[in-house]
């Protein structure tokens, strides 16, 4: 089981589990102790990796309550107290020469979702489903090695796992991570992603951030002036760190067409996508990313 906010070590651990022929169980870093313990117990996990966390108390509680569980701490001050340290294991380990065979129907990961009611449900996801979803994404979006990704949505969520982890690993795309929530916007500006996917809530917050600085009536007036129109659009994109983004995406929850229309009016075309955990996130997508095709 892996409980951590997004970081490079998350990727390394997931790859290590694949190469070691283990099944990964990603858990949201905001999960409470009861949820973590349930997922660990239900999945019959033999180890728990704790990493970058806003509050390690819940993870620490599970580790302390389950002494039979192997625990490994990633190299962050906010990680829980564990039996083993990630850096020490890397330094002392002898790389295995064995390479397990991963067939399409072989179980890769158990991803727990809230479901519609009751306890979390574990979706059994295979290597074949992962490979297919990522390859479709790479083909449809045209992901290239010179693209840049920014990973901040929880990697325990299937969307981020496919879009970010899959694209970076199978597409060879460099990926950056936010230092913290407080530095989020500055981190995006520094990295200038060419592909950026988000959720309706964050796109709404971005809109509010813009409107707080530039009221809608004033924005509407400025957008009607031909020369100023292009300048305003450029400045807004730069203010969000998205002026180099060639694909903007939205998924994971319903989004208002009015919000998408608003972004289109300021020169940012957001592509909708829909999928489920059970389908490894990739089911439908607006293609070829046309703002006049909202909802199709």
What are the language-model segments listed below?
Residues 14-20, 42, 166-170, 207, ...:
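Short hydrophobic alpha-helices that are characteristic scaffold elements of the AMP-binding
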Residues 54-104, 210-239:
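ANL superfamily adenylate-forming
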Residues 108-134:
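Conserved AMP-binding A3 loop
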Residues 131-148, 155-235, 244, 269:
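Conserved AMP-binding/adenylation subdomain of ANL enzymes
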Residues 176-178, 244-250, 257-296:
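Conserved ATP-binding loop and adjacent catalytic segment of the adenylate-forming AMP-binding
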């Amino acid at each position: 089981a892996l409980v951590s906010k997004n970081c490079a070590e998350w990727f390394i651990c997931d790859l290590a589990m694949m190469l070691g022929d283990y099944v990964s169980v990603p858990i949201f870093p905001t999960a409470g102790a009861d949820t973590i313990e349930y997922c660990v117990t239900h999945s019959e996990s033999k180890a728990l990796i704790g990493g970058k966390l806003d509050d390690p108390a819940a993870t620490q509680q599970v580790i302390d309550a389950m002494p039979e569980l192997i625990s490994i701490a990633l190299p962050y001050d906010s990680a829980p107290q564990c039996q083993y340290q990630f850096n020490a294991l890397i330094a002392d380990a002898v790389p295995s020469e064995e390479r397990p065979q991963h067939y399409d129907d072989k179980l890769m990961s158990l991803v727990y979702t809230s479901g519609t009611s009751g306890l979390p449900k574990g979706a059994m996801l295979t290597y074949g489903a992962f490979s297919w979803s990522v390859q479709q994404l790479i083909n449809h979006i045209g992901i290239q090695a010179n693209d840049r990704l920014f990973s901040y949505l929880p990697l325990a969520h299937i969307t981020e796992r496919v879009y970010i982890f899959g694209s970076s690993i199978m597409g060879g795309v460099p990926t950056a991570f936010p230092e913290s929530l407080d530095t989020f916007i500055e981190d995006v500006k520094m990295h200038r992603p060419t592909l950026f996917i988000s959720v309706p809530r964050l796109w709404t917050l971005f809109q509010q951030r813009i409107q707080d600085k530039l009221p809608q009536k004033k924005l509407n007036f400025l957008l009607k002036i031909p020369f100023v129109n292009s300048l305003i659009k450029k400045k807004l994109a730069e203010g969000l760190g998205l002026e180099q983004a060639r694909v903007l995406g939205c998924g994971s929850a319903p989004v208002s067409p009015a919000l998408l229309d608003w972004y289109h009016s300021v020169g940012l075309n957001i592509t909708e996508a829909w999928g489920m955990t059970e389908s490894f996130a990739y089911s439908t997508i607006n293609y070829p990313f046309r703002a006049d095709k909202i909802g199709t």
